[in-house]
Amino acid sequence: MALASLAAMPMSVGATEKPNVIIIIADDLGWGDVSAYGNRTVSTPNIDFLAQNGACFTNGHASSATSTPSRYGLMTGMYPWRNDDAKILPGDAPLLVDTDQFTIGKMFQHAGYSTAAIGKWHLGMGEGKIDWNRQITPAGNAIGFDYTYLIAATVDRVPTVYVENGRVANLDPNDPISVDYEHPFEGEPTGVNNPELVKMHWSHGHQNAVINGIPRIGFMKGGKSAIWNEKT
């Protein structure tokens, strides 16, 4: 499951009339999958606590059934089918949301909130042909978020790193990141050629770079200090 959260906090300590707002987006999670909405097989106490102390909707609809389009709809308030590019994006796609567009982040900023986006993004970054070793712009900070800590692409795509306010977190400049979605890097393991390194068997499309024992989409080398650890 890939999670992302959008958070908005009042800028002023004295602004007690404004509640904190947290929006959690989860891939492949049905409304009936949490116990707050009736699931009796799986217990989700933390989500239930939020539901009990927040607002529950009983008639909600997603603008799309897939990742990028639904996130685009939530971010902009626009139907994703109105934008031909609002489809599942590759890991090195440029920022899908125009920096001039009004977004949910900008809405909260205009209302006096500090804003943050954390986790899976999947709305693209930069202007294409991303250099992961430099400042990446435009990204989330350009469309309404004061702070961002984002998965660079998706959990199954390279590079498997976090991007904090436009820069890869914990990156050693002496070990730069290289990413290619077409050609493997010599000497770097892949799911096809190195099955002994794979903890989870690959499926078609997910058979490229092996990172943390998991075969990914695309090829990557370098950036060892910045690679996330699924266990932590």
Tell me the role of every PLM-derived stretch.
Residues 1-6, 11-232:
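Formylglycine-dependent sulfatase
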